[in-house]
From Swiss-Prot:
Pfam families: RecO_C (PF02565), RecO_N (PF11967). It comes from the Bacteria. Belongs to the RecO family. Keywords: DNA damage, DNA recombination, DNA repair. GO terms for biological process: DNA recombination; double-strand break repair. One of its GO terms (cellular component) is bacterial nucleoid. The keyword Zinc does not apply. The gene is recO. Involved in DNA repair and RecF pathway recombination. It comes from Xanthomonas axonopodis pv. citri (strain 306). This is DNA repair protein RecO.
């Protein structure tokens, strides 16, 4: 199959043999595509190597043969965000999450839109943690894994003053008061869930619980195997 003039975001790149690269690209029309870029070393290939970098939006043509497509041509369509520190790790995270969750050769246009929006947010003044929670919410929705952010698992309106445990299958499970002390780290406030559903940034005190709860849901859909970027973020937090 010939893929011509397709737009895509570079999610991940690694060396293959001495002069080639294996590149994972997220496209709107073809889903996640694995590309084999042969012979990209040398001064005459500098522009191509520069285009095949994570976060870069490219236009490419390739021939699909089996699992990998043979790259014929690629060019950068813009300048990827220049990131450092926490935002650089966040860029690694959004790419790794979609690398694991986006199906190969199965287009999910919503995931393409999610990545494009998250990429813009990384280069903006939007609070980083809030941008990532919105990204996670939208990825789950795009994959058909969204849960109700207005009602709990029993169909009752979410109480902003209560705490909930997010279950990947059942959604928000209200935590009984007698269990609250032992479950506090594993729960999120109703106020944070309502805010997430309304696309309004929760209070700063509610953000850690929302992060942990969303991570638990994502971990389920990742098959119980976490992300390297999570380990890197936790290691960075311990050093601070």
């Amino acid at each position: 199959m010939l893929i011509e003039h397709e737009r895509g975001f570079v999610l991940h790149v690694r060396a293959w043999r001495e002069t080639s690269l294996l590149v994972e690209v997220l496209t709107e029309q073809h889903g996640r595509v694995g590309l084999l870029a042969r012979g990209v070393q040398g001064p005459r290939k500098q522009a191509l190597r520069a285009a095949l970098q994570p976060l870069q939006l490219i236009q490419f043509s390739a021939v699909q043969r089996g699992e990998l497509a043979q790259l014929r041509q690629a060019e950068a369509l813009d300048t990827a965000p220049r990131l450092a520190g926490d935002t650089m790790l966040a860029g690694f995270y959004i790419g790794e999450l979609l690398l694991r969750l986006a199906p190969r050769h199965d287009p999910v246009p919503e995931l393409y839109a999610c990545y494009a929006q998250a990429r813009r947010h990384l280069a903006s003044d939007l609070p980083l943690a809030w941008g990532l929670r919105r990204f996670e919410r939208d990825v789950l929705e795009g994959l058909g894994f969204a849960f109700d952010l207005q009602h709990d698992s029993e169909g009752q309106p979410i109480d902003p003053a209560a705490r909930y445990r997010l279950d990947p299958q059942d959604g928000a499970l209200r935590v009984l008061s007698e269990r609250l002390a032992q479950d506090r780290r594993e729960t999120v406030t109703g106020a944070a869930l309502l805010a997430l559903g309304q696309d309004v940034m929760p209070d700063a005190d509610d953000m850690p619980g929302l992060r942990r709860s969303m991570r638990g849901v994502l971990l389920h859909h990742l098959g119980g195997r976490g992300l390297k970027s999570w380990e890197m973020l936790e290691d960075l937090a311990r050093r601070r």
